[in-house]
Amino acid sequence: MKRDYYEVLGVGKGADADEIKKAYRKLARQYHPDVNKAADAEEKFKEVKEAYDVLSEPQKRAQYDRFGHQDPNQGFGGGGFDASGMGGFGDIFDMFFGGGGRRANPNAPRKGSDLQFGLSIEFTETVFGKETDVEIPKEAECDTCHGSGAKPGTGVETCKTCSGTGQQEVAANTPFGRIVNRRVCTTCEGKGKVFKEKCSSCRGSGRVKVRRKIHLNIPAGVDDGAQLRVTGEGEPGVNGGPPGDLYVVLRVKSHEFFEREGNDIYCEVPLTYAQAALGDEIEVPTVDGRVKLKIPSGTQTETFFRLRGKGVPHLRGNGRGDQHVKVRVITPTKLSDKQKELLRELAELSGEKPGQHGGEDEGFFEKMKRAFRGE
C-alpha cells in the first residue's frame, strides 16, 4: 500500500511550494543511488520523486488532496463497469483468474518507458550554464530484425495456444456459479502470432542495448537535484507508440571554497589581527574572478560583508543573487620575541595586563562567568 505523499516528503498538508521543494531536494540527495549504496535507496528515491511530482503540481496536488491515491476516474464513469473500481469484486476476479485477466489490448500502441540518468557537474557550471554531450545507455530498435523480433527470412506462424485470437478462455467454479473469463494469451502475449525463429541479435525482444549521444543545454542557475527533460529520448515505444522521455538528474559537486544557499553564495576569508584592528583592502575570490573588499577598522571575527550581484543567476528571471563573505580573525600561534614584546606594549597601552581582561570586554566575561555559575 502506498504511503501518504506528505508523509514521504516529511511535510505537513499545509506546506507551501518552497517547503515541498526543499524537502524533496534533501531527500533526493540522501537517497540518490549515485550517493546512497543501500539496497533500498533506489526504491526510496523513486518514492520521493513520485511524491514530489504530484505535490509540486497544483492541479495534481488538488486532486490528490481530494481523492488520495484512488483514481477518481475509476468505477462507472465513461467506460462502463470496471471491476477494479469496485473493491471486493475486483479481488474476487483476481482470486480466480489472476491479476492479468483484464489487461488492455496488448497490440495497442504504447508509449515507451521514461529513462533517468544522473550527471555530475561542477559548482561553477551551475552559475554560468553549460552545453555538453553525454552518452546515455538505453534500448533501441534492433537493426537486424527492424524491431520485429523474428530472425530475418523466417517469418511468423499462428499461435497454437490461442489459435491466433491472442486471448485464452479460463473457466472457474465460483460461489456465483461457473464463470468463463478471457485473458491475454501468455504464449504470444496477445499478438496471435509467434516467431518461427527468434532474431539472434535481440533474442526475440526486438530491442538491443546501445549508448546514444545526447546534447544537453544546462541553463545557468540550476541547483543540485534539478531535472532536465529531453523529450523522445527514452525507451522506444511499443507497437508503433511514441518513445518515452529522458530525465537527467543533476548532481552538483561540492566546492572547496564556495557554498550555495538558494541563489546566494557564501565563503569565508581569513584576516590577521592587524587587518581587523586597523582596517585594510583585501582581494576576495568570486565566481567571476577576484574583487576588492574594504575591511573597516575594528572589524570583529565572523562579520559578514555582502558583494551584490556576485551570486547565482535566477533560473526564471533576471539578475543574480549575492555573495556573502564571512571574515575570521586568525590568532597567531607562532610569535617571535619581538612580536610578543610589541603585543605586551599594546596591552599596557590599553590598560591591560597580559592574561587579564578589562575595559569594554569586562562586562562580556563577567556575563560568561555568571552564566557558568547559573546566576
UniProtKB/Swiss-Prot annotation:
Cofactor binding annotation: Binds 2 Zn(2+) ions per monomer.
Domain J: 4-68
Stretches that traverse the bilayer: none
Keywords, in A-Z order: Chaperone, Cytoplasm, DNA replication, Metal-binding, Repeat, Stress response, Zinc, Zinc-finger
Zn finger intervals (CR-type): 129-211
SUPFAM superfamilies per record: Chaperone J-domain, DnaJ/Hsp40 cysteine-rich domain, HSP40/DnaJ peptide-binding domain
Keyword Ribonucleoprotein attributed: no
InterPro entries listed in its UniProt record: DnaJ, DnaJ_C, DnaJ_domain, HSP40/DnaJ_pept-bd, HSP_DnaJ_Cys-rich_dom, HSP_DnaJ_Cys-rich_dom_sf, J_dom_sf
One GO molecular-function entry: heat shock protein binding
Main location: cytoplasm
Ranges for the CXXCXGXG motif repeats: 142-149, 159-166, 185-192, 199-206
GO annotation terms (biological process): chaperone cofactor-dependent protein refolding; DNA replication; protein refolding; response to heat
Cofactor: Zn(2+)
Residues the entry annotates as binding Zn(2+) 2: C159, C162, C185, C188
Matches recorded under SMART domains: DnaJ
Localization in the cell: Cytoplasm
Binding locations of Zn(2+) 1: C142, C145, C199, C202
Swiss-Prot/TrEMBL domain comment: The J domain is necessary and sufficient to stimulate DnaK ATPase activity. Zinc center 1 plays an important role in the autonomous, DnaK-independent chaperone activity of DnaJ. Zinc center 2 is essential for interaction with DnaK and for DnaJ activity.
Subunit architecture: Homodimer.
Family per record: Belongs to the DnaJ family.
Function: Participates actively in the response to hyperosmotic and heat shock by preventing the aggregation of stress-denatured proteins and by disaggregating proteins, also in an autonomous, DnaK-independent fashion. Unfolded proteins bind initially to DnaJ; upon interaction with the DnaJ-bound protein, DnaK hydrolyzes its bound ATP, resulting in the formation of a stable complex. GrpE releases ADP from DnaK; ATP binding to DnaK triggers the release of the substrate protein, thus completing the reaction cycle.
Annotated protein name in UniProt: Chaperone protein DnaJ
Organism name: Brevibacillus choshinensis
